[in-house]
């Protein structure tokens, strides 16, 4: 399953079955014009290190403070449970799990479910929700440390577009490899030049940003079906 996210209004367009699994995620309030005025090459370089400055530093370098709040993922994981019929015997991998907030809320909703998370950021993994520490690890989406067909569901939200195009393709293949059946991938995309300009103005970490149609072609070229 592939979703393309139009950054300015958080609209999700599904390329396969019509389903929006992020419908309950709060819509962001972003001052794109202000970011465009002050965004610098240095800001981008700092953000792409995915360290403390990106998560918990100045807003110009990333989140400007990345802490747990149940309003974000708690409503969303309920839809995950219903859509994939998740239960205590299910398994799920979050690729780009950051501090494990989504995994934490899911663990509360579906106790004893097998949960795993990987993230390229040592800082994020070191500062993960305490309850999730034993379930997450530093890892690369291009070469995941898991066996084939290891998880019932693999999720990658706003993750693979942070890679160069070739590496993005590798990550897609890895997602397909470790997934038994289901995967859910969300990427930034634009529909027109206005959205494209806004997306490039706001985005700090994205290296592969394409239009909706270009993403469709890319996923088809890489045999990704979700």
What is each PLM-predicted segment?
Residues 4-84, 91-145, 163-170, 174, ...:
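Class I (Rossmann-like) S-adenosyl-L-methionine-dependent methyltransferase catalytic domain
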Residues 152, 181:
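Conserved acidic residues
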Residues 155:
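A conserved beta-strand element that flanks and buttresses the S-adenosyl-L-methionine
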Residues 159:
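Hydrophobic adenine-recognition pocket in adenosine-nucleotide-binding enzymes
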